């Protein structure tokens, strides 16, 4: 619930909507996190979109997701991802990072893209910067992952899936 509230508040705020009543209803902890988030430099950049669905086709496979926010300063795009838990251990090669950076780079036809994990718990930021070389590596990894999923190489587990993608697990 906490994470959903912060995500919604950030989306409304970045779209320029009046959030006064929402801010008044925040708990002390939520207010502290919200004040940190709205004070980050990225919230002063040009807003491209919030809660932005994107997709990417590589070979026969489709990849997609929903960005928390996409902002821009000068000619650089910043993908913002608010984490109420922790950022991935290897953020550079996390599937979310790879898909989002590659999709935004291809859609906007630019190499000037950065993925910013915003760790709300520890009030830290972790940035991954896109490059053409990294994009090539991402494409290889994603195509290989899709091929493995579509082959018999990865048998479905018999245990209950608890990941955020459980709706599409086999």
Kindly label every feature range from the protein language model.
Residues 1-170:
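RecB-family 4Fe-4S metal-dependent nuclease core
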